[in-house]
């Protein structure tokens, strides 16, 4: 590994995404080639037991792009996928994003650099802070998201507002310490990780993003 570069895993948890996965991976590869030149990056598709053509599509792409990797899990759960892949990683930074790339990728380097430069241990995209832009989300879903934010902040006395945006970066050191204490294997994984991080004095930093439903 070239010591002049910071190694980075970009994990994409998926389940039956044959309709969108090829275009999303191609877009992410193109972006990373152009804008992540200071990182030794690889994309890891964490497949939670897809029964469609997702595996075949990713395997085809992995033969085309050396930085695209396929990881199969038979059990479902986004949290399980992330924890398994992050645990097996030896990269300096680890991240994940939703396969639909609903968060504008131009914000990704800002999150990466903030963790790389040690201004925080976990950087997260947020749809609920000032300057964020959310396009196409229904009023009902927006209301539910804000209610959930109010609920966990009130219950756990944490400062971050958006735990569920699929756009996060974590340092190797923080992951090694925190992951053994994270038990949820599904959608609550993100919230649990961030709560435990703040309670153990790891800095979580939110960044406004452009998010399209």
State where each predicted segment sits:
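A conserved acidic beta->alpha catalytic loop
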Residues: 47-55, 101
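Catalytic donor-sugar/metal-binding loop of nucleotide-sugar-dependent glycosyltransferases
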Residues: 158-159, 183-185, 194-212
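Acidic helix N-cap motif at the loop->helix transition within catalytic regions
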Residues: 19-23, 52-61
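Conserved donor nucleotide-binding strand/loop of the catalytic core
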Residues: 41-44, 55-88
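N-proximal low-complexity "stem/linker" segments adjacent to membrane-targeting elements
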Residues: 1-30
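Acceptor/aglycone-binding surface of glycosyltransferases and processive sugar-polymer synthases
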Residues: 73-88, 93, 105-187, 213
């Amino acid at each position: 590994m070239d010591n002049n570069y910071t190694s980075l895993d970009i994990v994409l948890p998926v389940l039956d995404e044959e309709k969108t996965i090829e275009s999303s991976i191609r877009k992410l590869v193109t972006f990373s080639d152009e804008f992540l030149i200071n990182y030794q990056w690889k994309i890891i598709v964490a497949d939670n037991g897809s029964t469609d053509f997702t595996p075949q599509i990713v395997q085809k792409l992995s033969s085309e792009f050396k930085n695209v990797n396929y990881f199969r899990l038979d059990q479902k759960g986004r949290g399980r996928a992330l924890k398994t892949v992050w645990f097996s990683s030896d990269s300096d930074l680890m991240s994940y994003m939703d396969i639909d790339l609903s968060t504008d990728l131009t914000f990704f380097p800002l999150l990466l650099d903030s963790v790389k430069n040690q201004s925080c241990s976990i950087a997260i995209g947020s749809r609920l802070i000032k300057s964020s832009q959310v396009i196409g989300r229904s009023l009902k879903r927006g209301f539910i998201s804000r209610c959930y934010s109010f609920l966990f902040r009130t219950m756990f006395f944490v400062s971050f507002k958006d735990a569920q945006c699929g756009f996060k970066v974590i340092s190797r050191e923080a992951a090694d310490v925190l992951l053994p204490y994270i038990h949820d294997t599904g959608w609550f994984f993100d919230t649990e990780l961030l709560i435990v991080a703040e309670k153990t004095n790891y800095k979580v930093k939110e960044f406004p993003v452009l998010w399209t439903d």
